[in-house]
């Protein structure tokens, strides 16, 4: 049996530790076909404001197991991965440590499994965790026919569309995002700091973020679409598409979906993909009409029995 020696720390990781975690994630991404950690935990690695605890197993100077637990007031989200001689044992040890830390911070552990990771899924099932939420990744191939059909998306009457201005539009974008995603546990909480962190990422460009406003109120954003183009990727992500409650049902969402498709085509991407909640029937219907189909799933687990002294989420 392999000895698993864990260390845990809050606050930003050192450059070397963060680099080692990213290397672990890259290796496991190549093996699994899906990144085992999502975007936010990677942003948190060096963020001094992130309210998270980093849990690491280190062998020979390399990080061979990593977990990140959100210990904020609304927290409990856990993402983890490992590349050990006994991977199941390492995953179990990371989960044990996360559960103990969660008790100290009075949060409920809610682990994520991204894509198909049988080792993590098996450990969670053995501990009594059950699926509570599912994110779907939808994808569609782009073709010349799309270029001809969507050559000029038409802005709905009464609205105008323009490129995002990072200086003057930040407040309005965050307000629109909060309204459009008031029901969403992560996206609806986007802050100025979160937006700033994403705008510092190498993939960010204002050319990939468009906003829709009423003709008479050019500063009030009621819809927006944001594309994310990772370096060396053949697929571009429809990163966020949001429409405020008051603007829904007026064709804004359909227009923004068509705009995203045309933008991807014009920049030479053969594929467009996006994330959507499995129970968001309105969004699923819209994307299905535009040719998107499920490609992978990401499942969030919880313990309904309130084991380890935790209460289930209300």
Swiss-Prot record:
Any Pfam family matching the protein: Acetyltransf_1
Binding positions for 1D-myo-inositol 2-(L-cysteinylamino)-2-deoxy-alpha-D-glucopyranoside per the UniProt entry: 39, 186, 228, 237, 275
InterPro entries hit by this protein: Acyl_CoA_acyltransferase, Bact_Acetyltransf, GNAT_dom, Mycothiol_AcTrfase
Protein's UniProt name: Mycothiol acetyltransferase
Annotated residues for binding of acetyl-CoA 2: 241-243, 248-254
EC number(s) per entry: 2.3.1.189
Gene3D superfamilies noted in UniProt: 3.40.630.30
PANTHER family from the UniProt entry: AMINOALKYLPHOSPHONATE N-ACETYLTRANSFERASE-RELATED (PTHR43877:SF2), AMINOALKYLPHOSPHONATE N-ACETYLTRANSFERASE-RELATED-RELATED (PTHR43877)
């Amino acid at each position: 049996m392999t000895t698993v020696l864990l260390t845990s720390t809050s606050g930003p990781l050192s450059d070397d530790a963060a680099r080692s975690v990213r290397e672990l994630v890259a290796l496991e991404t190549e093996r699994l076909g899906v990144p085992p950690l999502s975007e936010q935990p990677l942003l948190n690695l060096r963020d001094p404001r992130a309210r998270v605890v980093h849990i690491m197993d280190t062998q020979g100077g390399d990080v061979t197991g990593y977990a990140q637990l959100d210990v904020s007031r609304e927290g409990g989200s856990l993402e983890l991965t490992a590349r050990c001689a006994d991977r199941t044992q390492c995953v179990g040890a990371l989960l044990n440590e996360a559960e103990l830390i969660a008790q100290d911070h009075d949060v409920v552990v809610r682990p994520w499994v991204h894509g198909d990771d049988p080792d993590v899924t098996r450990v969670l099932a053995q501990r009594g965790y059950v699926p509570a939420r599912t994110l779907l990744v939808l994808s569609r191939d782009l073709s010349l026919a799309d270029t001809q059909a969507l050559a000029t998306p038409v802005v709905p009457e009464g609205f105008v569309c323009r490129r995002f201005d990072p200086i003057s539009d930040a407040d309005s974008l965050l307000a629109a995002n909060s309204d459009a995603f008031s029901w969403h546990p992560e996206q609806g909480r986007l802050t100025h700091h979160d937006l700033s962190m994403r705008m510092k990422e190498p993939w960010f460009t204002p050319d990939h973020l468009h906003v829709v406003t009423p003709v008479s109120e050019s500063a009030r954003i009621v819809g927006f679409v944001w594309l994310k183009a990772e370096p060396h990727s053949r697929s571009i992500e429809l990163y966020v598409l949001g429409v405020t409650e008051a603007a829904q049902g007026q064709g804004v969402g359909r227009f923004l979906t068509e705009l995203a498709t045309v933008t991807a085509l014009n920049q030479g991407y053969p594929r467009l993909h996006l994330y959507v909640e499995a129970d968001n029937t309105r969004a699923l219907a819209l994307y299905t009409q535009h040719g998107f189909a499920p490609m992978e799933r990401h499942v969030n687990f919880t313990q309904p029995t309130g084991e380890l002294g935790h209460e289930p989420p209300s």
